[in-house]
């Protein structure tokens, strides 16, 4: 047992994400026996003093079963209908199963809109923290019924990581039908080796994760690695493991070397910067010259208009924008001090020239370093 695994086992607040394949009867609705098994393991974690937030897939699969559909639909309105029907069964199942262990569950449905708005983000954080303080197990899912393509998280791995940021959890456990991350595709290479530990933000790991998509789920190993990187921003460890392993949650809590453990390698971001980093949808893009790129990456300074060569998109003051280098690679994300039109007028100019161009000066920086997060 490594020291890191021991620390993992001592973590108090856990986010547990369980994929569709582990909750359904091969697409034929919910597997109530499987749900009962997960509830029993979670109840034991709670009895040991740990707090648990459950991010559960399965609503669409259950809805498909109730509606008699055998193939996952592609049309958004059909997915939303299936989610609405299936959510009823999912909530009823969790409420009943957790009651057997003397536990209360709460349904929490979120969209990216809820987390991109600062006030709603803080409200969601307060609600989740209150539920945990009351000993309740929040069961979180994306609000598929109202989410549009523009405001979707895209997968529950991403949602789980953002909920981890929201609640300042120490551990994110992503349970899947795979044993973890391998150095080669195990389906094609019999000698593929499991990656036991790594750094959550190591770009080399992404090269090992070819995107995969099943009929019921939306994400593959690549989405799980991106989720781990997001979770690391608040200092959380991510453990990707097979939900087919017996007593998997208890064994993780005991510090057993199971699955792939991805560790944070930087200090946690401040709460406000976690919120900025968690924005999945940027309103615009600022293309930087090589000098500005270097200053941001190496010194983490504020972004001045003189270092911007192009402005893409339409945005307002206070919106989230992405900063990219001359080759289009993301450098940072931040809250911009000027609208897109204003930014186009002052780009390539020094800060002391802003008033002469616009007739006023809101801020000398396009993005202040306190509102800037390096990617």
Swiss-Prot record:
It catalyses: L-glutamate + ATP = L-glutamyl 5-phosphate + ADP. Pfam families: AA_kinase, PUA. Transmembrane segments: none annotated. GO terms for biological process: L-proline biosynthetic process. It is found in: Cytoplasm. Keywords: Amino-acid biosynthesis, ATP-binding, Cytoplasm, Kinase, Nucleotide-binding, Proline biosynthesis, Transferase. Its EC number is 2.7.2.11. InterPro entries: AceGlu_kinase-like_sf, Asp/Glu/Uridylate_kinase, G5K_ProB, Glu/AcGlu_kinase, Glu_5kinase, Glu_5kinase/COase_Synthase, Glutamate_5-kinase_CS, PUA. This is Glutamate 5-kinase.
């Amino acid at each position: 047992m490594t020291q890191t695994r021991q620390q993992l086992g001592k973590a108090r607040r856990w986010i547990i994400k369980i994929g569709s394949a582990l909750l359904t009867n091969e697409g034929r609705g919910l597997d109530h026996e499987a749900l009962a098994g997960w509830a029993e393991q979670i109840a034991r974690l709670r009895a040991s003093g740990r707090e648990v937030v459950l991010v559960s897939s399965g609503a669409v699969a259950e809805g498909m079963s109730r509606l008699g559909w055998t193939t996952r639909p592609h049309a958004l309105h059909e997915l939303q209908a299936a989610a609405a029907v299936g959510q009823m069964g999912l909530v009823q199942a969790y409420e009943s199963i957790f009651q057997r262990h003397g536990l209360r569950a709460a349904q929490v449905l979120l969209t990216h809109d809820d987390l991109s708005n600062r006030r709603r983000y803080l409200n969601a954080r307060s609600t989740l923290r209150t539920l945990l303080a009351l000993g309740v197990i929040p069961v979180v899912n994306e609000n598929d019924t109202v989410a549009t393509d523009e405001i979707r998280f895209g997968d529950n791995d991403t949602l789980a990581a953002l909920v981890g940021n929201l609640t300042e959890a120490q551990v994110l456990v992503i349970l899947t039908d795979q044993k973890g991350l391998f150095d080669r595709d195990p389906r094609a290479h019999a000698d593929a080796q499991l990656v036991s530990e790594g750094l959550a933000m190591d770009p080399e790991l992404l090269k090992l994760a070819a995107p995969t998509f099943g009929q019921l789920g939306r994400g593959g190993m690549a989405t799980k690695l991106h989720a781990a990187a997001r979770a690391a921003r608040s200092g959380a460890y991510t453990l990707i493991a097979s939900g087919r392993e017996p007593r998997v949650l208890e064994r993780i809590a005991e510090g057993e070397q199971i699955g792939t453990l991805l560790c944070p390698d930087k200090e946690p971001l401040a709460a406000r910067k976690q919120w900025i980093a968690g924005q999945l949808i940027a309103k615009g893009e600022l293309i930087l010259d090589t000098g500005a790129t270097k200053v941001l990456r190496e010194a983490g300074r504020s972004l001045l208009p003189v270092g911007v060569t192009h402005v893409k998109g339409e945005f307002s003051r206070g919106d989230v924008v992405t900063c990219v280098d001359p080759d289009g690679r993301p450098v940072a994300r931040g809250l911009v001090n000027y609208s897109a039109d204003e930014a186009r007028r002052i780009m390539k100019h020094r800060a002391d020239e802003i008033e002469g161009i616009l007739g006023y000066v809101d801020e000398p920086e396009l993005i202040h370093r306190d509102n800037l997060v390096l990617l």
